[in-house]
Amino acid sequence: MRLRREISEFFTLAWFTRVLIIWALEVAGLLFLVAILPGLTVINWDTAIWTILLISLLNALIWPTLVYLTVPFTVLTFILLTLVFNGFIIWLSGQIDPSFESIGYWSISLGALGLTVINALLIGFLAIDFHESYHRYVIQQFSSKKANSAKFNTPGVMFLEIDGLSAPVLRNAIEMGQMPTLARWLNSGSHRLIEWECDLSSQTAASQAGILHGNNFDIPAFRWYEKDNGKIMVSNHPRHTAEIEQRMSNGNGLLVNEGASRGNMFSGDAPDVMFTFSTLAGLSNVHTKTYYHYFINPYNFARMIELFIWDIVLEKYAAWKQKLTDERPRVRRRGAYPILRAFTTIFLRELSIYMLIGDMFKGIPSAYTTFVGYDEVAHHSGIERPDAIDVLRKLDHQFARLEEAANQSPRRYHFVVLSDHGQSQGATFLQRHNMTLAECVRRLISEEHAVESAEHASEGWGSLNAFLTEFMKDEERRASRILRGIIKPRTYSGNVVLGPDHRHYVHDKKPIEKRAAEVVVLPSGNLGLVYFTDWKERLSYEKIRENFPNVIPGLVQHPGIGFIMVRSEENGPMAIGAKGTHFLENGMIEGEDPLKNFSSNAPEHLRRSDTFPHVPDILVNS
């Protein structure tokens, strides 16, 4: 009975529709192979066309069945079976029909390989986002191994973080019909949309440390300089992230009770972590097994490859369209960025969803996952540009799949969708003023002073580096050993470093103070941090005016700077703008309030940042 039910579920109308489409395209593909391969020859087209139709029909029928049968095995088994099958039917066709001639081992082998590639592309493309396909090849595979539901009396929680998504953008996306799953949850009353305001440093490290550990004290920006040790701390460098978590955690984080951390910056003290920046240094081999389980499934493998390639095509089209219409502001999107984008929007998303579905069928009590794709695309395309909204639409579709899996899992689950921070649309400081903040500071001090700066690399590079670092640490897998050999020149202290931050890691072997840099300028989103390294303590407003008399007046009068914060020996912390000063200690305002166009909470944010041990000598706000 079970076999009969499985057969009836497999051979559906959708299956037969796909077979017909594949058949037609197989004919075109085989005709193409006959045209380009010298060993495949058609002597009489009147009769050979029927042979070609037969070969194509056999492929169209057998291939979906092979995918179904080989799901429990590996991609290698799947490829070998299809190569042997295609080679056999090409040879057999030549024996049966003299008008279809296949001469020589290589012509048969290349023909078989060509058919296999064509089949893989067709099957992957046609099943790429079919609900039925995903259900059968992913959800049902987990469902067959799910835990005993009798064990779980309390519901679990899945925390789904969309990196960099602001409340207004989310509302607009829902109103435009781009996020129907979230709209349905809101309309049903199961969810509410609540807006919150993040800290002064609007970035993942500060927000996620607070969410997962209840503490984000002394994270002044995405990257900052520490005078006590002469080191630049970068939030998404694994060894720095581990150190930050050690400072933040009291051992009782959000996920401490048998929870799971998936693709986050911090662990939330979860006992089960995968692809989490702060724990990469202590990984064991078990953590990479899920990756292998994902890729040995032929459906997952074909789906990932085709989605990845298609996203690169979408990115190239979006970049071309921006240039064609002269859409501004825009940033450079060449080089490795299309691959980096596909890695964050497709590769990490697909792995994260796969891991969460597996977690739910195991019945884990809680899991927290960060989806970084929207943030990466929004930084390059714009926060509400079509391709950024498209990332949200596709992510919403994945949330529906999680919901479907939860309905079949052994434990009931609640979904909490949240964001760590938002972002605003605008040109960069460099685009507007033809100089970086570091160059601006350099012009305001004497030439004898050395100025050090560090590029703010895309967070996507950090995600890619973290994944490669985790993957290569598996001593048992040959693929990991090969990867270690390939990227050894870009590996430092056991961590992979690709992208612009490679230069920072080279420099990081020597503390900044030993390289005679007297001024360190670090950009971080809307903030700029200026440190004077000849002083071990925080330099006061009065001493800055005494030693660098042009810096403060020059910064506050610059059209690209909203205000700066410094600490006065006499008046305490002050926010200084072009036309006035806000004395943060007592709330007094002299002249025009530089904070009037910002949140009403801005003074409180600044007062708190002023208490950080590693707050800069001058905090610059755009």
Regions found by a protein language model. Give the residues of each.
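Active-site-proximal N-terminal segment of extracellular/periplasmic enzymes that hydrolyze or transfer
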Residues: 133-190, 432
